[in-house]
């Protein structure tokens, strides 16, 4: 451990390209062996304030990797990540990745989402850059999975963002509402109209999560009328169609649907969300799944028109 810390000290004195290159190597190691980073998170966190923004971004991505695979290792740097998220002068991609890391930490360790962090996540949905909003919504869904109680009084405010142009924002927020509704279904009353409007959402996974949330409300003591049309026949992907069908069936009163496909189950949500996000962000054919722009075969890993990462 002491030798590794000494190496990190020497790395801080190296040039920016060397720092960035070595941190990428460290991130690759973290993907394979995250447990070896125990007690190294704090020394690594000093690179979050590096003078070079590419170094800061690489470090933030490193902590996303650690927070997702071995959250206990990254837990000591919650404050450092929160400071980057709260810094309006910080490069927005750095803040986006810090929000993502904080979300993974909150899912595993709910106390990591302090009231101040939660406020930054919620407020940023209204004012931040589009790329950051996606990660803020993702982090909020993880907060809800870790402790749904934290968002039960914020449903109305968050529901206002279900009209976002970004389908990932809509997906993550409807997912957060399902997580809240699994424990506090009555809390969803504050967002019922916005959830009903998602019956016409262009994305079948968003429609499915909205149906799931409304189903939780309908299966409680709350009397709620549900949309009858959810566009089930218009879905081309078999996986997306199955996802939507089971949740619409649940919403319309089929309790058996929950047992069949893990509907209205937070563990299932946690296990399947990354796969669903990949399905949403993977372009069909040659176009961007968000704005439809034609994409070159060997172009950058993001849409040059709307900025959606792939």
Give the role of each language-model region.
Residues 1-310:
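Acidic, polar-rich N-terminal leader regions of halophilic archaeal proteins
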């Amino acid at each position: 451990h002491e030798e590794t810390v000494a190496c990190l000290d020497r790395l801080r004195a190296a040039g920016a390209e060397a720092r960035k290159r070595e941190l990428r190597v460290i991130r690759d190691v973290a993907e394979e062996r995250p447990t070896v980073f125990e007690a190294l998170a704090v020394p690594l966190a000093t690179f979050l304030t590096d003078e070079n923004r590419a170094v800061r971004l690489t470090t933030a991505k490193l902590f996303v990797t650690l927070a997702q695979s071995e959250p206990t290792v990254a837990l000591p740097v919650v404050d450092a990540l929160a400071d980057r998220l709260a810094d309006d002068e910080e490069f927005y991609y750095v803040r986006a990745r810090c929000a993502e890391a904080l979300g993974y930490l909150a899912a595993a360790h709910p106390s990591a989402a302090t009231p101040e962090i939660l406020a930054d996540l919620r407020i940023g949905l209204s004012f931040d850059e589009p790329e950051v909003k996606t990660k803020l919504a993702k982090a909020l869904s993880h907060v809800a999975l870790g402790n749904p109680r934290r968002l039960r009084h914020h449903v109305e405010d968050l529901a206002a963002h279900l009209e976002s142009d970004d389908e990932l924002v809509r997906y993550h927020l409807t997912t957060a509402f399902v997580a809240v509704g699994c424990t506090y279904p009555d809390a969803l009353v504050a967002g019922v109209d916005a959830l009903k409007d998602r019956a016409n959402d262009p994305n079948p996974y968003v429609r499915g999560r909205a149906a799931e949330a409304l189903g939780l409300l309908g299966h409680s003591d709350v009397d709620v009328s549900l949309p009858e049309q959810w566009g089930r026949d218009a879905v081309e992907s078999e996986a997306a169609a199955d996802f939507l069908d089971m949740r619409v069936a649940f919403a319309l009163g089929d309790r058996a649907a929950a047992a069949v496909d893990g509907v209205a189950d937070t563990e299932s949500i946690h296990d399947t969300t990354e796969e669903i996000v990949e399905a949403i962000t993977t372009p069909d054919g040659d176009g961007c799944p968000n704005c439809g722009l034609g994409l070159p075969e060997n172009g950058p890993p993001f849409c040059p028109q709307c900025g959606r990462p792939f």
